[in-house]
């Protein structure tokens, strides 16, 4: 059809342009599709085998293994245990604890500040053991020496047993401020851990403290209704032999064994418990 005579060529061009379909709605899917294709092409074009080359793979494996190994070592050997109740069951009869003695409460128990790793971990020259009561509060492990029973000190209104002071003084002189290693066996009813204890008087000569107390006549074999803890039959035999020899020689508390009023630490505690029960019933 012929356009009217007054219609110009420019108008015709504008009409042609306006009659073209809009392409905006088709552009966005096209862009997304193209981007997806570009990413897939880039991924496929990446040479992933480059990361498997020995020059890249070996350092990565070594670094990862080193980090995991360091974490395991820290958790197993360098983590500090604040109190006896925090000792993991996996430690009992399997591991030992190294620490510095901060106080001696009686003739057969004391407290240590756990120093995992010892001098190799910097304790004593890079890291200091606290000394104030405030710093040590809730930060010491209460240890009961396995297999031995020392004479009682005066406490809770009870009198002191003969040789109680001597046993306490001996243990204090041997342990206070020293490094010890405790082979832990089990917890007891007083939130302590029962352990065989070795004190380092010299660098390479640890001394079994419980065994030495028996030899000096400053303790007896621990006898209990539920069974005493020695750390094994061999250790028990060694302790009983030491007690028998001290008794034969009349050392320490065995000097007065012939006396009619002589009491073992176990007999003394049983008598005190009976007196306390009698007071409670009246």
From Swiss-Prot:
Keywords from the named record: Calcium, Endonuclease, Hydrolase, Membrane, Metal-binding, Mitochondrion, Nuclease, Transmembrane, Transmembrane helix
Keyword check for Transmembrane helix: yes
First-level EC class: hydrolase
Compartments where located: Mitochondrion; Membrane
Record-linked InterPro entries: SNase_OB-fold_sf (IPR035437), Staphylococal_nuclease_OB-fold (IPR016071)
EC number: 3.1.-.-
GO terms, molecular function: endonuclease activity; metal ion binding
Keyword tRNA processing: no
Catalytic-site annotation from UniProt: 144, 152, 192
Principal cellular location given in the protein's record: mitochondrion
Topology of the protein relative to the lipid bilayer: Single-pass membrane protein
Chain residues that bind Ca(2+): 149
Domain (TNase-like): residue spans on this chain: 95-256
Annotated PROSITE patterns: TNASE_3
Protein name, UniProt field: Probable endonuclease LCL3
Organism name: Arthroderma otae (strain ATCC MYA-4605 / CBS 113480)
């Amino acid at each position: 059809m012929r356009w009217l005579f007054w219609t110009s060529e420019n108008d015709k061009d504008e009409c042609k342009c306006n009659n073209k379909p809009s392409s905006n709605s088709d552009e966005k899917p096209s862009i997304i599709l193209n981007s997806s294709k570009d990413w897939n092409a880039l991924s496929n074009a990446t040479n992933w085998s480059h990361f498997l080359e020995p020059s890249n793979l070996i350092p990565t494996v070594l670094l990862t293994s080193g980090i995991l190994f360091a974490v395991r070592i820290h958790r197993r050997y360098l983590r500090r245990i604040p109190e006896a109740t925090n000792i993991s069951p996996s430690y009992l009869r399997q591991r030992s604890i190294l620490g510095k003695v901060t106080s001696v409460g009686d003739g057969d128990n004391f407290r240590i500040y756990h120093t995992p790793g010892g001098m190799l971990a910097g304790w004593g020259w890079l890291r200091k053991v606290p000394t104030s009561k405030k710093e040590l509060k809730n930060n010491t492990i209460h240890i009961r020496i396995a297999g031995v029973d020392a004479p009682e000190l005066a406490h809770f209104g009870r009198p002191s047993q003969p040789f109680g002071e001597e046993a306490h003084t001996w243990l204090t002189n041997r342990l206070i401020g020293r490094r010890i290693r405790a082979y832990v066996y089990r917890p007891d009813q007083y939130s302590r851990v029962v352990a065989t204890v070795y004190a380092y008087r010299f660098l390479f000569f640890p001394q079994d403290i419980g065994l030495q107390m028996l030899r000096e006549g400053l303790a007896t074999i621990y006898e209990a209704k539920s069974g005493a803890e020695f750390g094994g039959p061999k250790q028990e035999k060694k302790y009983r032999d030491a007690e028998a020899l001290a008794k034969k020689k009349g050392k320490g508390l065995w000097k007065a064994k012939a006396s009619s009023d002589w009491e073992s630490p176990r007999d003394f505690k049983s008598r005190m418990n009976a007196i306390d029960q009698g007071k409670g019933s009246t």
